[in-house]
Amino acid sequence: MIAAQRVQAPSCENKIRDAKATKRKLVEAALAAFSTRGYEASSTRSIEAAAGVKRGLIAYHFGSKAQLWTAAADYLMSTTEHDLGEALASLNEADEAARLRLFVRAYVAFCARYPELNRLMIQEGMDRDWRLDWLLERSVRPWYGHVCRIFDQAAELGVAPNFEAHHFYYIVTGAAT
């Protein structure tokens, strides 16, 4: 006689952990796809394949490709706000003359760690639509304000070149990508 084996159902905690891991894989795969190929050229099928998950899980976890894009961009912006927020906070401890130099180093290091940020901006900048507006409101405008403020303070001290802050913003962003 063959003994019956008991199969234990996965615990609720395991299901939640698995769902979070799946969502994280999808967000990371989507970010890679959207930042390199763009929104229109990235199919949900290819994103699910890159994430190594079953077909249909984008619809299950996010509802739509647009909501996945928002989740991926939000993840990237949250990372940006956290990492660059820490860098900005540390600038307050630096003397006035060192702030600009430390800022540039922190921003270039961040862009090296997360090249998807500027890649996504380039991809979305090709089409004027809701995604570009979302990025501008959520990331570019607030960050631009910080950059201009730091540059203007350095210019007042004579430790920054004599040109407009917006030129500096584009020079640093271009150099960092």
Predicted region positions:
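Amphipathic alpha-helical packing segments from all-alpha helical-bundle domains
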Residues: S78-G85, A98, W130-E156, H167
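Amphipathic alpha-helical segments used for helix-helix packing
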Residues: A112-W134
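N-terminal intrinsically disordered/low-complexity leader segments
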Residues: M1-A21, A32, L88
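Short, solvent-exposed beta-strand-terminating loops
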Residues: T173-T177
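Helix-turn-helix
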Residues: K25, A33-Q67, A71
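Generic hydrophobic, amphipathic alpha-helix propensity
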Residues: T22-L31, I47, L68, A72-L76, ...
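Conserved hydrophobic residue
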Residues: Y39-E40, R131, A160
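Hydrophobic alpha-helical connector segments
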Residues: G85-L117, L157, A165-V172
